[in-house]
Amino acid sequence: MKTLLLTLLVVTIVCLDLGYTLECHNQQSSQAPTTTGCSGGETNCYKKSWRDHRGYRIERGCGCPSVKKGIEINCCTTDRCNN
C-alpha cells in the first residue's frame, strides 16, 4: 500500500511538473541570443525597446516591469517568447 501511494505521488509530481521554471531571452540589443531561467515563480518574459542617443535599444528579461513614456514593452508568458 505504501509503495502504491509513493508511486502515485511521484507520478503526480512528474505530471504536474512542480519544478517548472520559465525560460526567457535576456540578451540586450543586437547581442547573440542567450536565455535565463526565471526565479521566484515568475510567469512573464518581457522585451523593452526605445530609442536614445546611441540608437535603437532593446532589453529582454524575466518579469513585466512598468515603463516610462516613450518606452515600448511587450510581455508574454511562454518559454523564450520575448525574442
From Swiss-Prot:
Tissues in which the UniProt entry reports expression: Expressed by the venom gland.
Give the molecular function GO annotations: acetylcholine receptor inhibitor activity; ion channel regulator activity; toxin activity
> Where does the chain cross the membrane?
none
Database matches in Pfam families? Toxin_cobra-type (PF21947)
Matching entries from Gene3D superfamilies are given as: CD59
The signal peptide, as residue positions, is: 1-21
SUPFAM superfamilies (UniProt xref): Snake toxin-like (SSF57302)
The answer, when asked if Cell membrane is one of the entry's keywords, is no
One Gene Ontology cellular component: extracellular region
Q: What keywords were assigned to this record? A: Acetylcholine receptor inhibiting toxin, Disulfide bond, Ion channel impairing toxin, Neurotoxin, Postsynaptic neurotoxin, Secreted, Signal, Toxin
Superkingdom in the source lineage: Eukaryota
Which cellular compartments is it found in? Secreted
Q: Which PROSITE patterns match?
A: SNAKE_TOXIN (PS00272)
- Please tell me where this protein is predominantly located: secreted
Listed as disulfide-bonded, the cysteine pairs are C24-C45, C38-C62, C64-C75, C76-C81
* Family named by the database record: Belongs to the three-finger toxin family. Short-chain subfamily. Type I alpha-neurotoxin sub-subfamily.
Q: What does this protein do?
A: Binds to muscle nicotinic acetylcholine receptor (nAChR) and inhibit acetylcholine from binding to the receptor, thereby impairing neuromuscular transmission.
Task: List the protein's name.
Answer: Alpha-neurotoxin NTX-2
